[in-house]
Amino acid sequence: MPFLTVAGARAHYVHRRPVPASRPPVVFIHGAGGTHQQWLYPVRDLSLSLTYALDLPGHGKSEGPGRDSITAYSDWLVAFLDALGLEQAVLVGHSMGGGIAQDVALRHPDRAAGLGLIATGARLRVTPAIFDGLRQDPEAVVRLVCDLVFGPETPPEMVRLGRRQMGAIPPDVLCGDFVACDAFDVMARLGEIGVPTLVLCGSQDVMTPVKYSTYLRDQIRGATLHLVEGAGHMVMVERPDAVLQALTTFLQQLQQSKL
């Protein structure tokens, strides 16, 4: 389980290095209250790509305080890429992680070789009830969020695992994540993104509905949209095979476009 020093604190990540690695490196970014564990299937099974899945600061095994803005998280991500020695990577982000990926593409366009925007949006408003609940009963908020993020066909044991994983995130870090999401809004700037982009979401996502992904597809030049039927917000956990197939096709097309 490798660690790097990023912004003065230890950052944890997992990675896979196939031989040969003939496609651009891929960095997976989890969402609010998440960890690298949500990306274990694509990290393990995405062939021909050097893959990394990280724990954002304050999450999982990464040390340091969490952040309370998307720009602060994206600055941290750029420092993470520097520490790895990666000049460019395909940034694949889920929910808040998708916001981070968009922000890097807008403010540090030379660092993004492509984007995978998974169950996310150009604006990520959070209901005030979440913030009220975090102050009064964080455990209840975790239960509520996990009841919403999984699709109707999700096995109960997967929902319970999600609750345990999110419940392990310190409440102040979780609150900072939601503050970051609530303030995020790049709806007017999507036309500035100039890298190949895959947009993917579940048809039953109630957190970032399909219309969010449709807007991303329509506003980012050349973006493609892949809809996973029956899946909810945690589409990469619920339907890892479908997400892996879509990412593989996207990376193949990205590689061919650079030949």
Model regions: which residues?
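Active-site loop/oxyanion-hole signature of alpha/beta-hydrolase fold enzymes
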Residues: 9, 41, 50-93, 245
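Conserved HGGG/HGGXW glycine-rich cap/lid loop of the alpha/beta-hydrolase fold
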Residues: 9-63
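Conserved alpha/beta-hydrolase "nucleophile elbow" surrounding the catalytic nucleophile
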Residues: 30, 89, 93-95, 202
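Flexible "cap/lid" loop of the alpha/beta hydrolase fold
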Residues: 102-142
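Conserved alpha/beta-hydrolase catalytic His-Asp/Glu region
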Residues: 133-194
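Short beta-strand/loop motif that positions the catalytic acidic residue
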Residues: 193, 199-201, 205
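Conserved alpha/beta-hydrolase "acid-adjacent" motif
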Residues: 206-212
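Catalytic active-site module of serine/aspartate enzymes centered on a nucleophile-bearing elbow/loop
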Residues: 223-259
